[in-house]
Amino acid sequence: MWKWEAENDAKGVVVIAHNILEHTGRYAYVITMLRRNGYHVIMGDLPGQGQTSRANKGQIENFQTYHESLLDWLKIANEYKILTYVLGVGLGGLILLNLLEKVELPIEGMMLISPMLELQKNGKNRKDKLVSNIGKISKDTRFNVGVEPKDLTRNLEIVEETVNDGLMLKKATYHWYNTINETMKDTMAHIHDIQPMPTLLMYGTKDLIVDTRAIDEFKEKYQTPELYFKAWQGFYHEVHNEPERDEVMRYILTFLNNSVNTMGFIVEDDEIVEI
């Protein structure tokens, strides 16, 4: 787990829960933008990914392992005693929503980028039929997940970096896949249990990883008086890495600034600092 403090007076602290297969190092741009605009950042690699144990790459015992990591990061964030927000990306969004269905968290709002509520059903990643046909296999047996860097973003610079990134996972266990699948279904079945709070929900309309229809269903069922929603036309899964990522970060920072403003922190409309 790492901490990055704001470059000026802190308005709040943002805990980031990242996506499947990736790691903290892919968020340098997002972290820099948050810090320059007055937000501390807390982030770590999720279990089985990034710089965590080599022996357990692409494997978790149960989904609660993810919950525990997020709760640990929130505990550290709350030590600042300022407004706290969570940014959940893909799998990180699923972790946050599933946890919120079970407990109330000490946060003022959440931001969801392409939350993983249902995977795209295409030839590359339709592993559910394959798994069901195999029957009982070792939970440690790994398969190629089939997520290609070019499917994540239209940003060719990021694609090249991802291709050459030794910390990116390519394989995961069938147990991990089944756990994710079961959790997605469970989360969609209990949306009404999520505590209402200011929420920013975004996805790209050309997402090749998750089925955005499930995100739309979540949007309709989630009961909150303050929901900011943006479907980025033509964007891929990682909207925060797209060539237009400056626009995406401005949207995120506007949400955060509006929220902290409501809580009593005065923020000027033109205060957003670009890189």
Where are these regions (language model features)?
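Short beta-strand element of the alpha/beta-hydrolase
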Residues: K11-N19
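Catalytic nucleophile-loop/oxyanion-hole region of alpha/beta-hydrolase
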Residues: L21-H23, G50-Y80
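Conserved alpha/beta-hydrolase
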Residues: R26, I31-A55
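Alpha/beta-hydrolase fold nucleophile elbow
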Residues: N78-G90
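Alpha/beta-hydrolase-fold enzymes
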Residues: V89-L167, K171-A172
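Short beta-strand/loop motif that positions the catalytic acidic residue
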Residues: L201-Y203, D207
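Short alpha-helix in the alpha/beta-hydrolase fold that links the catalytic acid
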Residues: D211-E220
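Catalytic active-site module of serine/aspartate enzymes centered on a nucleophile-bearing elbow/loop
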Residues: E226-I275
